[in-house]
Amino acid sequence: MQFLVLALASLAAAAPSIKLRAPSDVCPALDTPLCCQADVLGVLDLTCEAPSDDTSVSNFEAACATTGLTARCCTLPLLGEALLCTTP
C-alpha cells in the first residue's frame, strides 16, 4: 500500500514536467522531435532536449547538430530521457 501511494505521488509530481507540443511535420503521428545524446538500441534515448527549430527535417537536424546531439523522433519524452525513438 505504501509503495502504491509513493508511486502515485511520484507520477503526480512528474506530470507538470511533461511538455506537450503541437504536432510538427518533422515527426510522424504523436512522436515528439528531440535532440538526444545517446541511443540505447532505439528503445531509450538519454539526455534529450527540445530543438530550437523544428520547422523542417533539415532545420531540425541542423539545430541538433549545432549542440552535438542527434535528431530523434520519440514516442514518450520524460524528464530528459525518451522512449521508442527513431530517426526523422
UniProtKB/Swiss-Prot annotation:
Record flagged with keyword DNA repair: no
Gene3D superfamilies: Hydrophobin (3.20.120.10)
Localization, UniProt: Secreted, Cell wall; Secreted
Distribution of this protein across tissues and organs: Only appears on young aerial hyphae. HCf-5 is the most abundant transcript in sporulating mycelium.
S-S bridge residues: 27-73, 35-64, 36-48, 74-85
Keywords tagged on the record: Cell wall, Disulfide bond, Secreted, Signal
GO cellular component, one term: extracellular region
Stimuli inducing this protein: Expression is decreased during tomato plant infection. Expression is up-regulated by nitrogen starvation, but down-regulated in the absence of carbon. Expression increases noticeably upon sporulation.
Organism domain of life: Eukaryota
Signal peptide annotation: 1-14
Family membership noted in the UniProt record: Belongs to the cerato-ulmin hydrophobin family.
PANTHER family linked to this entry: HYDROPHOBIN (PTHR42341:SF2)
Function: Aerial growth, conidiation, and dispersal of filamentous fungi in the environment rely upon a capability of their secreting small amphipathic proteins called hydrophobins (HPBs) with low sequence identity. Class I can self-assemble into an outermost layer of rodlet bundles on aerial cell surfaces, conferring cellular hydrophobicity that supports fungal growth, development and dispersal; whereas Class II form highly ordered films at water-air interfaces through intermolecular interactions but contribute nothing to the rodlet structure.
Subunit details: Homotetramer. Further self-assembles to form highly ordered films at water-air interfaces through intermolecular interactions.
Name of protein: Class II hydrophobin 5
Organism: Passalora fulva (Tomato leaf mold)
